[in-house]
């Protein structure tokens, strides 16, 4: 029998007296299939993964041939991707680990072997999503916020700590250590692994998936990875591949270098705008060209981080000498760095700007010298605003029609003011456009010493000039690792940030994910009483409506330097390039240019204080560096003892009544429309992460279980309890359901009685009647975070199908993996164009004969008996997704497969 590709590609190389096995990409070239040098680097990484893991069952010669022919025959075929590791954060990680514990219990209930439910690849969970900014602008803020974090989340943390003892291959990085993507970049990523495989030291690329959409940040160092839903990550942990169609790869050719005044943040926002315009959803993006060598690795990581915002699966920078320089800077050993370089050169994956360019699906060019200081907002990251246009852009947005770029308000809004009487007797006035929150936050930027030290230098110059931040601005600094604190202190810049109120509040995601904490009660009252349009400026990656703070309606993304500058100005309704920020000690006007550091000032500071010793010291004891975490009392029993009275951790209902065999695909009849939504409905809208309102179904559930309102915590922190989460589905305070006109938030019309009621209440009534549900939506449905609860909650509400004009990648995949059918209107058609108003009964003519991307007949029966018929595409993107749907979900399939073994 002829050898398969795996056997043909197996080779060896020697380094420092050690022999290493590897799987040579040239094997496919030797078969005359392709020229490796013409394949994009990201495709080469996928190809190596297939060669090395070929088993003639899950991964076959056909998969390898199809991927090798990238660029020919329209990229037909699919990739069964088995990453080398998985990363989790605690909001998405808790439900993932709950599901593993639940799978174990289900396995035990039927007498199966519970040791089969164990991660088969290394899993690292970093606890970063739970810290909230309760205390700020004082030296004790870090300790106070950490203490509150542990009080609120003790049960969750006990559960995650238990898992480190119960499961193999699972580690947890404790709270107050850093943000998952920054810890991944600075410490966890090996770039090239060496593992013992059948007694041989085998070298291969580091690859991963993570339960957070910004997992993509790791592509900045040449490690291929992206965010997936928790469900897909769980399957990956249990040895299941992720299947996806062979991607298109858009090459972004970078030329020249960034000018004075422009930062990596400005470049990332510009890339986001350009690629959203281009349309790269579901595609890989790969950066190449002479401009790449002018970008420090930290800048590349900032750009790679924002791939979800530009819609790509990943934004990949192949490994080059700059990557190796960063590895040395962050304390990786010289021996390992030498191995990384040797392996990647041997296997044709080391980037050299002098080599011929690969063949990309399409190429766009970006001249770095044209990037200028910018912000994005007020409601989407792709809506770029040059700093020079910011004042006029904000003023136009106030009266522009309500939507992504407008608030739909009257000109009289500019006359509004709110008087604030502080408890200490001082007074302040807030007006339209004033800044309520200024936050240096998010791994997007805090991983980048150039922008962080740049912000410190802005603060230093501002303090020296005598500038102060207005009392109504809530300021905070939450870096993604302790290394940042080390270099800010080392440069002597932290005291200046402290003087402006940017004290350290925690190491975690904070404001970027909506954990901005409360404003002062007197400020909240003033804003609410006057219904004042106030703003936030943050160095985050998302600014969707309702995300940052319920009372802050306009949110702008900006570099840490601009966050400090706008905090000083106190308003976004200012032309920072031409109007003074304030008056200095000498009574003279101070302008932005007076406090802005030069490129040389910043790079000299970086060179002097960012050292390998800092990284080595901070990561030396990363899994045990928090005493509060170390003191948590846990058992080492392999089965979790679910407490029926817990409001944080419950055994989910996904496996209840599971049959031994999967069902068949059958038509969906008599569905009622629960929600009709427009474009750009985010996973934040579907499953919010932030505050739980006392009058919401989730709030009432918690009160019924004797949880006081002050201890509600957030939706994100309660993702281990399906009872809370199903009640929070479609409950974002800013979601607008067209079936409940005049309302905002999670309401719908229950058609049998025409009553407007909370979506959860209506869904439960439909469930009692045995009526399935449908959601109608516009373009980009499910954009934003890789939030698996957006799909899990949809399933538990009884939604059988979503019919949208288009989907964001991760959410579509999550719906299928939860047994919900994603359908797509024909191009040019929509719910509105077909005259669907949501009162109809919907039937979908689907059966066992369906294939991926087939069209099925959908019938909508009007109240007067008229029928509207249309075709919709079945968004199964691979054959295996049909299996997921048939089983009722991927976890059900995994459990059945494990039982069958």
UniProtKB/Swiss-Prot annotation:
Enzyme class, first EC level, given as a word: lyase
EC number of the protein: 4.2.1.3, 4.2.1.99
Molecular function GO labels: 2-methylisocitrate dehydratase activity; 4 iron, 4 sulfur cluster binding; aconitate hydratase activity; metal ion binding; mRNA 3'-UTR binding; mRNA binding
Binding sites annotated in the UniProt record for [4Fe-4S] cluster: 443, 509, 512
Keywords in alphabetical order: Iron, Iron-sulfur, Lyase, Metal-binding, RNA-binding, Tricarboxylic acid cycle
UniProt pathway: Carbohydrate metabolism; tricarboxylic acid cycle; isocitrate from oxaloacetate: step 2/2; Organic acid metabolism; propanoate degradation
One GO term (biological process): propionate metabolic process, methylcitrate cycle
InterPro entries on file: AcnA_IRP_Swivel (IPR044137), Acnase/IPM_dHydase_lsu_aba_1/3 (IPR015931), Acoase/IPM_deHydtase_lsu_aba (IPR001030), Aconitase/3IPM_dehydase_swvl (IPR015928), Aconitase/IRP2 (IPR006249), Aconitase_4Fe-4S_BS (IPR018136), Aconitase_4Fe-4S_dom (IPR036008), AconitaseA/IPMdHydase_ssu_swvl (IPR000573)
SUPFAM superfamilies registered for this protein in UniProt: Aconitase iron-sulfur domain (SSF53732), LeuD/IlvD-like (SSF52016)
Family label: Belongs to the aconitase/IPM isomerase family.
NCBIfam families: aconitase_1, PRK09277.1, PRK12881.1
Role this protein plays: Involved in the catabolism of short chain fatty acids (SCFA) via the tricarboxylic acid (TCA)(acetyl degradation route) and probably the 2-methylcitrate cycle I (propionate degradation route). Catalyzes the reversible isomerization of citrate to isocitrate via cis-aconitate. Could catalyze the hydration of 2-methyl-cis-aconitate to yield (2R,3S)-2-methylisocitrate. The apo form of AcnA functions as a RNA-binding regulatory protein.
Protein name as it appears in the record: Aconitate hydratase A
């Amino acid at each position: 029998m002829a050898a398969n590709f795996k056997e043909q590609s197996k080779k060896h190389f020697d380094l420092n007296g050690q022999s290493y096995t590897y799987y040579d990409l040239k094997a496919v070239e030797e078969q005359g299939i392709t020229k490796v040098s013409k394949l994009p680097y990201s495709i080469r990484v996928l190809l190596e993964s297939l060669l090395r893991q070929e088993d003639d069952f899950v991964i076959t010669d056909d998969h390898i041939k199809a991927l090798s022919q990238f660029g020919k025959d329209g990229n037909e075929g699919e990739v069964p991707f088995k990453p080398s590791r998985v990363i989790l954060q605690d909001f998405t990680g808790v439900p993932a680990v709950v599901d593993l514990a639940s799978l174990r219990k289900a396995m035990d209930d039927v007498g199966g072997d519970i040791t089969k439910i164990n991660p088969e690849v290394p899993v690292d969970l970093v606890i970063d999503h739970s810290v909230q900014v309760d205390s700020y602008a004082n030296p004790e803020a870090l300790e106070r916020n950490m203490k509150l974090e542990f009080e609120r989340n003790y049960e969750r943390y006990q559960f995650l700590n238990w898992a480190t003892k119960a499961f193999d291959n699972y580690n947890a990085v404790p709270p107050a250590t850093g943000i998952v993507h920054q810890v991944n970049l600075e410490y966890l990523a090996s770039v090239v692994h060496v593992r013992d495989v059948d007694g041989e030291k085998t070298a291969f690329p580091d690859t991963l998936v993570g339960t957070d959409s910004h997992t993509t940040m790791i592509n900045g160092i040449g490690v291929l990875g992206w965010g997936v839903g928790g469900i897909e990550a769980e399957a990956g942990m249990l040895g299941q591949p992720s299947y996806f169609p062979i991607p298109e790869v858009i090459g972004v050719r970078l030329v020249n270098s960034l000018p004075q005044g422009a930062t990596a943040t400005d470049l990332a926002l510009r890339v986001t705008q350009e690629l959203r315009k281009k349309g790269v959803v579901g595609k890989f993006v790969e950066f190449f060209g002479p401009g790449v060598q002018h970008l420090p690795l930290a800048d590349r990581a900032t750009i790679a981080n924002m791939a979800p915002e530009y819609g790509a699966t990943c934004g990949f920078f192949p490994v080059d000498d700059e990557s190796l320089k960063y590895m040395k800077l962050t304390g990786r050993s010289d021996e390992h760095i030498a191995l990384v370089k040797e392996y990647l050169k041997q296997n044709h994956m080391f980037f050299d700007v002098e080599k011929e360019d690969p063949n990309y699906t399409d190429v766009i060019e970006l001249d770095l010298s044209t990037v200028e200081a910018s912000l994005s907002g007020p409601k989407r990251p792709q809506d770029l605003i040059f700093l020079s246009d910011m004042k006029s852009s904000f003023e136009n947005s106030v009266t522009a029609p309500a939507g992504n770029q407008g608030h739909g308000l009257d000109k009289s809004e500019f006359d509004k003011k709110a008087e604030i009487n502080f408890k200490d007797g001082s007074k302040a006035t807030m007006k339209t456009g004033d800044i309520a929150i200024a936050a240096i936050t998010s791994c997007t930027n805090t991983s980048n010493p150039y922008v962080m030290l740049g912000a410190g230098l802005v603060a230093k110059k501002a303090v020296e000039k005598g500038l102060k931040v207005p009392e109504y601005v809530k300021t905070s600094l939450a870096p993604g690792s302790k290394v940042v604190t080390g270099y800010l202190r080392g440069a002597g810049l932290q005291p200046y940030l402290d003087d402006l109120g940017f004290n350290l509040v925690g190491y975690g995601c904070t404001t970027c994910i909506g954990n901005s904490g409360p404003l002062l009660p007197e400020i909240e009252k003033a804003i609410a009483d006057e219904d004042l349009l106030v703003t936030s400026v943050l160095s985050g990656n998302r600014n969707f409506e309702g995300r940052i703070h319920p009372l802050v309606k306009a949110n702008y993304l900006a570099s840490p330097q601009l966050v400090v500058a706008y905090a000083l100005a106190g308003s976004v309704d200012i032309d920072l390039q031409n109007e003074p920020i304030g008056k200095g000690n000498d009574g003279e006007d101070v302008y932005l240019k007076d406090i802005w550091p030069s490129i040389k000032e910043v790079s000299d500071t970086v060179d002097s204080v960012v050292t390998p010793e800092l990284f080595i010291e901070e990561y030396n004891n990363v899994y045990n560096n928090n005493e509060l975490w170390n003191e948590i009392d846990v058992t080492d029993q392999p089965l979790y003892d679910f407490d029926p009275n817990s409001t944080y951790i419950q055994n989910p209902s996904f496996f209840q009544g599971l049959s031994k065999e999967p069902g068949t695909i059958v038509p969906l009849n008599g569905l009622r429309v629960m929600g009709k939504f427009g474009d750009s409905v985010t996973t934040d809208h579907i499953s919010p992460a932030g505050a739980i309102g006392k009058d919401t179904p989730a709030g009432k559930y918690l009160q019924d279980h004797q949880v006081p309102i002050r201890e509600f915590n957030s939706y994100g922190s309660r993702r281990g309890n399906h009872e809370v989460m199903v009640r929070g589905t479609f409950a974002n305070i800013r979601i607008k359901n067209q079936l409940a006109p005049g309302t905002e938030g999670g309401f719908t019309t229950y058609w049998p009685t025409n009553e407007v009621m909370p979506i959860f209440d209506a869904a439960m009534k439909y469930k009692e009647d045995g009526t399935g549900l449908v959601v109608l939506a516009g373009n980009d449905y499910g954009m934003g975070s890789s939030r698996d609860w957006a799909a899990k909650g949809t399933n538990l509400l009884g939604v059988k199908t979503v019919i949208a004009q288009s989907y964001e990648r991760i959410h579509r995949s999550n719906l299928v993996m939860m047994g919900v059918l994603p359908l797509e209107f024909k191009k040019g058609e929509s719910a509105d164009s077909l005259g669907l108003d949501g009162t109809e009964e919907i039937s979908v003519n689907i059966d066992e004969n369906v294939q991926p991307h087939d069209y099925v007949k959908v019938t909508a029966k009007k109240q007067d008996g008229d029928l509207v018929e249309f075709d919709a595409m079945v968004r199964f993107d691979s054959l295996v997704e049909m299996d997921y749907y048939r089983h009722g979900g991927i976890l059900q399939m995994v459990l059945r497969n494990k039982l069958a073994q």
